[in-house]
């Protein structure tokens, strides 16, 4: 792919104008696509419906903004490969995206000064020139790693999750926890994490419905939460840690598990609601003054929001003087880590987080 040699040359001024005028830009692309006579475009919009289409444009815009802000090419590349894979699996001809990119370019030109628009539109020239590469890479199924020792159990859990009820899945998990010395964190690492990836991939490839994907992830969330609560108890006398997802995240099981893991290492953990606004999150941190804040992003489109929150928290030591740890799948979509300025530590897994916690105490 050309991403290794592609360099962002977009000024902060151009990026700020792009952010400020994003609503108008998105709205124009939405209208242009809906009135387009291109048969591929008409088929695409008709198949997914206006609501999903508009949400996809907003996600696209947030992802572009996050990629530029963090100067991370892989965020951009990986998202579009994923997008092509999703819609190809739904029998949509992804050549329709070429026309969409042209509409984005036109809309950016209409809403920004020419010099700023030309900088932003470098991105769309890149997308157009890499269109065929995205198609090729989207056709390759990504292997999900499962420890060979647990392959059979993984298959059994997956089948039970998709074909049985809550009680059967719960019993299966219970019966096999002893293989992990009843360590729910190890069980989650070896089986639940790849299981969640597999469910997501099956939805992506149109092998299961949205409803089935939602049921499966909700069931995993409920059962793992119950098992964790059975084994850990909060001590309010311990140093305070605040945990939270950032942005419009749909799943928060990961950050809940991280919170209980931190709690098991002698901290009092408060997990803030996934529906909390950025302002409410920051104000809560200022009021509670925790020793540590742990922030997670699953969706790459929320990386920019994470960067902005971390930057604000670190801007005044009188308001917050604690440490900030960041993590989540959205930061590790490739072998490269998405860099977030001013964060004290970026954790890939519980082992890395454990090392950080030992030094913190």
Locations of regions flagged by a protein language model:
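Core of compact, soluble alpha-helical bundle domains
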Residues: 1-82, 88-102, 109-178
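Peripheral docking tails and interdomain loops at the edges
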Residues: 327-361
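Long amphipathic N-terminal alpha/beta scaffold segment
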Residues: 175-252
């Amino acid at each position: 792919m050309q991403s290794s040699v592609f360099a962002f040359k977009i000024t902060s001024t151009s990026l700020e104008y792009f952010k400020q005028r994003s609503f108008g830009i998105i709205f124009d692309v939405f209208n242009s696509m809906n009135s387009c006579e291109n048969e591929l475009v008409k088929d695409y919009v008709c198949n997914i419906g206006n609501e999903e289409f508009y949400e996809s444009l907003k996600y696209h815009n947030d992802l572009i903004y996050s990629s530029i802000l963090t100067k991370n090419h892989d965020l951009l590349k990986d998202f579009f490969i994923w997008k092509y894979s999703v819609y190809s699996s739904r029998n949509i001809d992804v050549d329709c995206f070429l026309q969409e990119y042209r509409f984005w370019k036109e809309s950016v030109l209409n809403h920004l000064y020419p010099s700023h628009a030309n900088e932003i539109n470098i991105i769309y020239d890149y997308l157009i020139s890499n269109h065929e590469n995205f198609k090729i890479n989207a056709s390759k199924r990504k292997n999900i790693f499962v420890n060979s020792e647990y392959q059979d159990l993984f298959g059994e859990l997956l089948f039970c999750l998709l074909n049985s009820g809550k009680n059967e899945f719960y019993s299966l998990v219970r019966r096999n926890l002893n293989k992990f010395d009843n360590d729910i964190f190890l069980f989650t690492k070896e089986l639940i994490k790849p299981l969640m990836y597999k469910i997501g991939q099956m939805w992506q490839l149109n092998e299961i419905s949205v409803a089935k994907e939602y049921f499966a992830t909700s069931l995993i969330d409920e059962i793992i939460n119950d098992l964790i609560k059975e084994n850990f108890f909060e001590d309010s006398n311990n140093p305070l840690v605040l945990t939270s997802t950032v942005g419009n995240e749909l799943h928060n099981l990961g950050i809940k598990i991280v919170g209980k893991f931190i709690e098991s290492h002698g901290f009092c953990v408060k997990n803030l609601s996934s529906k909390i606004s950025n302002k409410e999150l920051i104000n809560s941190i200022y009021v509670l003054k925790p020793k540590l804040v742990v922030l997670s992003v699953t969706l790459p489109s929320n990386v920019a929001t994470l960067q902005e929150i971390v930057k604000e928290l670190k801007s005044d030591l009188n308001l917050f003087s604690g440490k900030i740890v960041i993590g989540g799948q959205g930061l590790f979509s490739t072998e490269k880590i998405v860099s977030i300025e001013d964060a004290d530590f970026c954790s890939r897994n519980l082992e890395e987080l454990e090392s950080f916690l030992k030094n913190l105490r």
